[in-house]
Design a protein with these regions (language model features):
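Class I S-adenosyl-L-methionine-dependent methyltransferase catalytic core
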Residues: 2-128
Length: 128
């Protein structure tokens, strides 16, 4: 599993946008287009499983109503920027399981090294 953690974003953000990024009012964060473009140049993503119809980064995407956790990601190259709340563990578990099946999954997540999901699902992958 490929994993990009939030410190990659910090280098690209100003103080103003960084403050917005770490607000606790929401657990959803739009990926800066410039960051996505750099990653997409390398990976050629085909699926965004954690999207809204307004912030989808790939032509194929799943919204909350479609529940990307219940979908099969086989044959896809996945860009995943999951909600950063408690449900992140379920998303990381899904990404890990799909990666074991051979799916490339790049996750944009906070570096919460004190959590189980980090140790169980992020640490076995490639962290950038």
């Amino acid at each position: 599993m490929k994993l990009a953690v939030d410190f990659a974003i910090k280098k690209m953000m100003t103080k103003k946008t960084s403050a917005i990024h770490f607000s606790s009012r929401s657990n959803e964060w739009a990926t800066p287009q410039s960051l996505f473009d750099r990653l997409d140049d390398e990976f050629k993503f085909t699926l965004d499983p954690c999207a809204t119809e307004y912030n989808a980064k790939c032509e194929k995407f799943y919204t909350l109503a479609q529940d990307g956790l219940d979908q099969d990601w086989s044959g896809e190259i996945v860009f995943m920027n999951p909600p950063y709340g408690r449900e992140i563990s379920g998303w990381m578990k899904k990404a890990y399981q799909e990666s074991i099946r051979g799916v490339t999954v790049v996750c944009l997540v906070p570096s919460r090294t004190d959590t189980r999901w980090w140790h169980n699902y992020a640490m076995p992958g490639e962290i950038r």
